[in-house]
């Protein structure tokens, strides 16, 4: 059977999609790029915030249109399927099956029945849907933190860490098929292992992953500030493969709001962690995520956030307006902020960060940096790639450069930076 697949949402959901596609291919089915050629369509949805839910619903309706012309089966899974299982089944009759996340332990058998496979759909080798030299590895699922604004624990449950042995089996396979950049992900990577080993095991995992031959860059995303302990930093410093990239979602800088968000620790603790990182890794890249317009946020508290951004000068920052998510503690809080004020604050915050980013990038002019070559622009001698300071999938900026010699995509080269914009830098490939 020909199967169309649509994956929405974050990189953690993408890993789920790649694993589902692996099972489908093992069952003898073919993944097709164009839904019009499909006999069944699977939509792996996101349901994290309102805009993601809207995108998921719109995609489901778009895929449902193919049922008008063909006898297409429409299967919906993922976060939206978990959060609104009954609603989807009742209100969108075009859907043939809704498979919530917490039924993924029976996913293989459900797909086998729906798709009519004669082959057992069990754990299979990973499909990589993006560039073959880059892959994500999800080290745990769910989250045991209870941030007041976040629906992830409602959707995916408490943290469930994989064993190191299971992770290493996947890592070794990915390295064997040519993956050079490995990105470890979870809702909270620094809490990895606490649920099944009884202690924080990220340092041990990093030490084992760094021994795998073929890997060139190892990156860790989603690190909770108070869990970036000395052993984590020590493990990262022990291997040149582990890039000094620290993704620390902080959410705000006002201690009253941090407490209201149910975030652990005041901003002063984050300052101490940042100082420690810079001491051990002078060339570290620091990234964070902020929320503006959380209930009761005053103008003065927002300005405190702006001042904090100016003080830290994060290399990278993503920011979002607060999204009111039902069944979360923040949903019924007094002092909900008007959308217009939220958007205005977001624009002001990102304008400040844009200037900081531009300043940081301009400091790179004249330097020679290592770049992973990812794209060639047409027939010209211009390429696009990323440095160790840039996370995959356009999360951060790019390095745009020229080369006198043709370059192999997926290779690493040296680039001298000659110009810089707010988010991208420009340069010329130089010989080793």
Task: Write out the residue ranges for each language-model feature.
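Proteins enriched for Cys/Gly/acidic motifs involved in redox and nucleic-acid/cofactor modification
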Residues: 1-192, 231, 246, 268-279, ...
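Conserved beta-strand core positions
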Residues: 3, 40-41, 135, 182, ...
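Short strand-connecting beta-turns/loops that link adjacent beta-strands
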Residues: 36-37, 68, 144, 253, ...
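Short glycine-enriched, charge-decorated loop/helix-capping segments at active-site entrances
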Residues: 47-48, 156, 196-199, 259-265, ...
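Conserved SAM/AdoMet-binding glycine-rich loop
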Residues: 74-78, 83, 93, 176-300
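Conserved, mostly hydrophobic/aromatic
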Residues: 147, 167, 184, 220, ...
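Terminal RNA-binding accessory module
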Residues: 332-432
């Amino acid at each position: 059977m020909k199967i169309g697949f649509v994956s929405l949402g974050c990189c953690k959901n993408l890993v789920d999609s790649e694993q589902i596609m692996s099972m489908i291919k093992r069952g003898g089915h073919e993944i097709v790029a164009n839904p019009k050629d499909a006999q069944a369509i699977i939509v792996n949805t996101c349901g994290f915030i309102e805009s993601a839910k809207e995108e998921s619903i719109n995609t489901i309706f778009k895929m449902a249109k193919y049922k008008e012309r063909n006898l297409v089966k429409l299967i919906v899974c993922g976060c939206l399927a978990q959060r609104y299982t009954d609603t989807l089944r009742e209100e969108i009759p075009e859907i043939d099956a809704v498979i919530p996340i917490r039924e993924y332990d029976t996913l293989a058998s459900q797909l086998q029945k729906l798709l009519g496979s004669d082959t057992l759909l069990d754990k299979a080798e990973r499909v990589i849907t993006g560039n073959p030299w880059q892959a994500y590895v999800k080290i745990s699922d769910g989250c045991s933190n209870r941030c007041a604004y976040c629906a992830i624990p409602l959707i995916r449950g408490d943290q469930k860490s994989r064993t190191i042995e299971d992770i290493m089996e996947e890592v070794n396979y990915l390295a064997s098929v040519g993956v050079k950049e490995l990105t470890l992900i979870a809702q909270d990577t620094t809490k990895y292992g606490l649920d099944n080993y009884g202690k924080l095991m990220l340092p041990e995992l990093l030490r084992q992953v760094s021994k795998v031959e073929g890997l060139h860059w190892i990156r860790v995303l989603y690190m909770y500030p108070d869990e970036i302990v000395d052993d984590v930093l020590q493990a990262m410093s022990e291997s040149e493969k582990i890039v000094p990239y620290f993704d620390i979602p902080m959410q705000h800088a006002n201690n009253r709001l941090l407490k209201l968000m149910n975030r652990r620790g005041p901003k002063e603790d984050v300052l101490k962690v940042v100082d420690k990182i810079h001491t051990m890794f002078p060339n570290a890249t620091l990234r964070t995520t902020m929320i503006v317009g959380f209930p009761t946020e005053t103008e003065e508290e927002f300005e405190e956030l702006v001042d904090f951004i100016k003080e830290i000068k994060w290399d990278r920052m993503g920011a979002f307006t607060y999204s009111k998510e039902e069944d979360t503690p923040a949903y019924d809080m007094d002092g909900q902020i008007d959308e217009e004020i939220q958007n205005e604050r977001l624009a002001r915050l990102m304008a400040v960060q844009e200037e900081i980013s531009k300043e940081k990038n301009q400091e790179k002019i004249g330097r020679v940096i290592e770049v992973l070559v990812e794209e060639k622009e047409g027939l010209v001698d211009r390429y696009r790639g990323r440095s160790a300071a840039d996370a995959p999938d356009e999360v951060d900026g790019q390095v745009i450069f020229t080369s006198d010699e043709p370059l192999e995509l997926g290779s690493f080269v040296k680039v001298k930076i000659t110009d810089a914009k707010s988010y991208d830098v420009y340069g010329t490939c130089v010989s080793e």
